[in-house]
Amino acid sequence: MNTHESEVYTVAPEMPAMFDGMKLAAVATVLYVIVRCLNLKSPTAPPDLTFQDTTLNHFLLKSCPILTKEYIPPLLWGKSGHLQTALYGKLGRVSSPHPFGLRKYLPMQDGATATFDLFEPLADHQSGEDVTMVICPGIGNHSEKHYIRTFVDHSQKQGYRCAVLNHLGALPNIELTSPRMFTYGCTWEFAAMVGFIKKTYPQSKLIVVGFSLGGNIVCKFLGENRTNQERVLCCVSVCQGYSALRAQETFLQWDQCRRFYNFLMADNMKKIILSHRGVLFGVGSKMVDSELSRLYTATSLMQIDDNIMRKFHGHNSLKEYYEKESCVHYIHNINVPLLLVNSVDDPLVHNSLLTIPRTLAEKKENVVFALTLHGGHLGFFEGAVLFPQPLTWMDKVIVDYATAMCQWEKQKPPCQSKDAQSNQTTCQENTS
């Protein structure tokens, strides 16, 4: 009896210690997963810049210090590209303003009706000039999206007029007037908007801005024809993928949950297309019932592009559609200053695609490629610990770069004029 009692009393005190060890192990495991998922150990750093050693680029970096300073995302979650992207996708922006604009309607030759919203500046531009931002949003987006409203409001307050394209078919309350909607690289509507701005405001200089898919469209537009670059001071592209053909393979991979994002975007595209089902699949349309059936079962953007989107412009195959609608074949024709912005942790743009802007910046002196460690896809939120600020790093860097270009245009040395034949060394001597 005494032996049993002694055994009981020697074992019992060890049980809580064992359970405490299990709890500690569980807590440690959870913390490890949190640290890994939130990428908390990742450092903050300035953007990795690729550019050539020119007088203009040195002026831009000096006048736009945000490009050389650390981008610091919110401490607890801002280093996760997935959370940055999710917050952008769900909320767009925090405490988004409501800028007031006028909607314009432009009839197209094929019967379609392009629409864009025009926002006048809320202050004088510091250069004293009339400057207009011509803005192309991301896939299926329009002027009413929160991230667009935030950017427009910030630009207006800095003295910029803003014209925002509404992608054909994207606005929920605007019916299509022809059996065609926006595609990955069709520049017709953007060209119509730019033409309207140039005609209505003949003294205005243009800043071209594109977000994600919009970045592809604006770069393709500028590279398609040299006349498209007239009166354009510069162009900024944020979070685009440059080549749909090369991106196609990566979008089918589960790495960085890219296949899941592909499914979500495909589902959103289906909703947009089906909201215009009567026009797109009705009388006079090239679409047939079998294509509508395949749309219902599509689980990827590639399936939708192959069954629906490529046929709006008569492309014979998905490969042909992606090749002809990607800016990678046109971007080298852009001669105005060009800022390309991407993020390492963007779950939608595979790192292999970033060789395109990096190589371009190494070869062309008008191009600056800025690659941030964090920011996700069109996130770039800033904040101390938990709550993000309404204005993002992305909003600031675009406006600061545009303002620096306006300053350069006003005070650039004679050797930097388009007709000048002076070499770079002479120019550097004149500006030193």
UniProtKB/Swiss-Prot annotation:
Q: Where are the transmembrane segments?
A: 15-35
Provide the GO biological process annotations. acylglycerol catabolic process; medium-chain fatty acid biosynthetic process; medium-chain fatty acid catabolic process; response to progesterone; sperm capacitation; steroid hormone receptor signaling pathway
Principal localisation? membrane
Q: Reaction catalysed by this chain?
A: Hydrolyzes glycerol monoesters of long-chain fatty acids; an acetyl ester + H2O = an aliphatic alcohol + acetate + H(+); a triacylglycerol + H2O = a diacylglycerol + a fatty acid + H(+); 2-(5Z,8Z,11Z,14Z-eicosatetraenoyl)-glycerol + H2O = glycerol + (5Z,8Z,11Z,14Z)-eicosatetraenoate + H(+)
Topology feature Cytoplasmic, residues:
1-14
Q: Name one GO cellular component term.
A: sperm plasma membrane
Glyco sites are at N141, N225, N423
Its job: Progesterone-dependent acylglycerol lipase that catalyzes hydrolysis of endocannabinoid arachidonoylglycerol (AG) from cell membrane. Acts as a progesterone receptor: progesterone-binding activates the acylglycerol lipase activity, mediating degradation of 1-arachidonoylglycerol (1AG) and 2-arachidonoylglycerol (2AG) to glycerol and arachidonic acid (AA). Also displays an ester hydrolase activity against acetyl ester, butanoate ester and hexadecanoate ester.
Name of the molecule in the record: Monoacylglycerol lipase ABHD2
